[in-house]
Amino acid sequence: MKKHSFAIKVCGITRQSDLSTAMGMGAHFCGFIFHPGSPRYIAPSRAAALDSALIRRVGVFVNQNAEEIMDIMKTARLEFAQLHGAHSLDCARRIGPEKVIRVLWPDRYESVDALQREMELWADSCAWFLLDAGSQGGGHGVLGQHLADLGL
């Protein structure tokens, strides 16, 4: 399995002032939510207008298919698609594995071994894994119990 370093992503950006603060604090990635049901949703054209010269741009996608994701990525000037829903390996491959961040919730797995098997399954179909706390959703700032078991 590929090994990656940790990186910091500030997600839910909707304003230039928040993006500028994230860049100033050394974040590596900024996340834009493209799930219409989210209170932090941003239109792709609005995300494109935000200046992020010093930080890598990520779109968070929940239910969109590969074609919709690729269209939004182009419009919003995104480098990465964070797959936050029930996306398939085929969807990730169509987007391009080098552009995909796969979200996993360690607390959903019965063991660290089960989580590692899922990561191995996805390893060739994504550039990064994002290990989110809790068992669903995101952005709640809770530490996951399996992270220590993974040696993280």
Model-predicted regions and their roles:
Residues 1-152:
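Conserved N-terminal beta1-alpha1 strand-loop-helix module at the mouth
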